[in-house]
Amino acid sequence: MIGLVLAAGAGSRLAPFTDALPKTLLPVDGERSILDVAIANLKHVGLDEIAVVIGFAADRIAERAPELERRHGVRLELVYNPKAEEWNNAYSLWCAREAFAEGALLVNGDTVHPASVEERLLASRGEELVIAVDQEKPLGDEEMKIHLTEEQLLGRIHKDVDPAGAHGEYIGLTLIEPEAAAPLADALEATWQRDPSLYYEDGFQEFADRGGRIGIASIGTVEWVEVDDHADLERAREVACRC
């Protein structure tokens, strides 16, 4: 099993900081970037082989890779997404299908959280995929919400899930077991071929609709933030200094 970080996005709502810099490289704790936090968390749970999907301003991450390897004691594999500025992240994750073929712990490259989330995921192994879910946070219309089946498996994942009936928010971390790799890659391919603007969570829905089993790991009362805009970045800096 490897660590896998999706870091191909541009982060247009964080301009001008991201005009020529991937948002995953934005500093959140001194010189530590969002990507530093993600790599450190994966290393903390014993994953020192890490693939990073790059796209927008890919050269900036490639330039930083040797320093990141030295700092964290890991080996990085860079996976290039040539459509990162045109298509959404269902294609981005599909680009990493060879990297996650033997299983992976997937982390969104714009999420700041403590390593306890990775620990929870690894402690919750059992299904083909396991997604990290915040079941404490009040939900609105913009969150990537989930609804569970009677078996406590993922039934639906989408922003349009009714907040009143939702069972939590997916926070951007997933454990992919080796046996799920090929069917997940197929589901992701079907998803981006249907509509390249779709998210990888739509690929998860396709995987579940085909009979794939997706469990959850409830993260408990944990501070985390998905960095989409300047307000998120300020909050990420508060969270990162406590990670």
Model-derived features: positions:
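Conserved beta-strand segments of alpha/beta enzyme cores
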Residues: T24, R75-E77, L153, R213-G215
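A structural signal for short hydrophobic beta-strand segments in well-ordered beta-sheet cores
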Residues: L25, I146-L148, I216
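Conserved N-terminal catalytic core of the sugar/cofactor nucleotidyltransferase
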Residues: I2-V5, R32-G103, R194
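Conserved core of the sugar-phosphate nucleotidyltransferase
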Residues: P114-Q193
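Conserved beta-loop-beta/alpha segment of the NTase-like Rossmann-fold superfamily
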Residues: E69-M144
